[in-house]
């Protein structure tokens, strides 16, 4: 008799547990009152709900047509990518999500100060691409392309990947429907963006988006790029190398040039022109004139202190300055006033296609 009672109790407990689990699963998938099964975003929203990425806006609603805010989007991203957020209220949790998304590089600084603003499509796509590690390259890097703002490039890629419609624009405000459909897509599908060709032998040891590096290389004069390739040099994005070099030199480095290895090492694209200046110095054979210009004009050149440490750094910084400000008459006039011989020397180099 006791055995029968125990078995009956076990069966009842098993049944109740199964009923609870079934009810919980059913509750998570019942949907939202304002989201019919015929809605184009139904599958996306239900996927996000089932994976606890969205809980709707309360009272059984999802509010698909309401504009999505930075705060709401940040919460969805953090839930989608298992990023821990802290807080005891929606306000605290969502603010934590915004801060975490900023640290991850998914949102910009504006999000921190204005988490309640509505997102435009360009911003939504840029954030989604950053989270999903989908690279975005400037249109100008492709044959026949033109330079576009960040959001316009995101729209271009979004259309190529069919993540937005042909009629969609970068500045239009997006809805919770749009956000749900986009997030569902990047979580469940694989996307490939063809990288533009590099003008030199490029090694991406850091495995980062090379867009900024390719844009920086566009600033280097073509005759120098041709000489770079002809001489067998390599442009290498290598965070580990630069980090180790910084430790050895006890200073913060973002670029370095190894003449023996014929390699420019970088951890930031902004160092491209300076390091290219070192290559130019090497290409010209380190002429004595460079040392003479340094001794005569470096200290009063108006350039940063680092440029005044030796002739090679002075030459590299002058090259950087002349490329960046070459079309700015006021900035070039400042260099001419402070370092007239140097200014004339670089003007002649430019006329001679950066060779002697």
Say what each PLM segment does.
Residues 31-32, 53, 212-220:
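Export/targeting segments at the very N-terminus of extracytoplasmic proteins
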Residues 1-27:
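Gram-positive cell-envelope targeting signals
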Residues 19-198:
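N-terminal propeptides
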Residues 216-218, 222-356:
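Active-site-flanking segments in enzyme catalytic domains
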Residues 13, 52, 60, 260-262:
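Beta-strand-connecting loop/turn residues
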Residues 149, 208-211, 215, 337:
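Alpha-helix boundary/N-cap detector
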Residues 198-210:
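Fold-level signature of zinc-dependent metallopeptidase catalytic domains
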């Amino acid at each position: 008799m006791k055995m029968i009672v125990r078995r009956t109790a076990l069966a009842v407990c098993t049944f109740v547990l199964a009923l609870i689990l079934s009810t919980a699963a059913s509750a998570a998938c019942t949907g939202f009152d304002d989201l019919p099964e015929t809605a184009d975003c139904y599958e996306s929203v239900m996927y996000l709900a089932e994976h606890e990425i969205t809980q709707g806006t309360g009272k059984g609603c999802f509010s698909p047509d309401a504009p999505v805010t930075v705060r709401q989007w940040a919460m969805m991203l953090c839930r989608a990518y298992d990023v821990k957020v802290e807080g005891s209220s929606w306000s605290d949790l969502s603010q934590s999500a915004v801060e975490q998304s900023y640290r991850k590089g998914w949102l910009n600084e504006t999000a921190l100060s204005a988490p309640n603003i509505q997102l435009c499509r360009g911003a939504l796509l840029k954030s989604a691409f950053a989270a999903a590690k989908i690279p975005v390259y400037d249109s100008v890097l492709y044959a026949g392309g033109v330079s576009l703002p960040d959001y316009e490039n995101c729209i271009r890629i979004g259309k190529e990947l069919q993540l937005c419609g042909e009629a969609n624009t970068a500045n239009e405000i997006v809805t919770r429907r749009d956000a749900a459909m986009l997030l569902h897509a990047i979580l469940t599908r694989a996307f490939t963006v063809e990288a533009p060709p590099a003008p030199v032998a490029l090694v991406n040891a850091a495995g980062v988006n090379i867009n900024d590096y390719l844009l920086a290389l566009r600033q280097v004069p073509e005759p120098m790029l041709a000489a770079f390739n002809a001489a067998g040099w390599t442009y290498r994005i290598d965070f580990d190398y630069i980090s180790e070099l910084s430790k050895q030199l006890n200073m913060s480095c973002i670029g370095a040039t190894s003449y023996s290895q014929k390699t420019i090492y970088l951890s930031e694209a902004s160092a491209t022109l300076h390091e290219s200046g070192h290559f130019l110095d090497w290409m010209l054979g380190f002429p004595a004139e460079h040392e003479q210009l340094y001794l005569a004009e470096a200290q009063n050149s108006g350039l940063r202190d680092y440029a005044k440490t030796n002739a090679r750094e002075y030459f590299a910084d002058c090259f950087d300055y002349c490329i960046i400000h070459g079309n700015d008459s006021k900035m070039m006039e400042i260099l001419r006033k402070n370092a007239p011989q140097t200014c004339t020397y670089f003007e002649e180099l430019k006329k001679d296609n950066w060779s002697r």
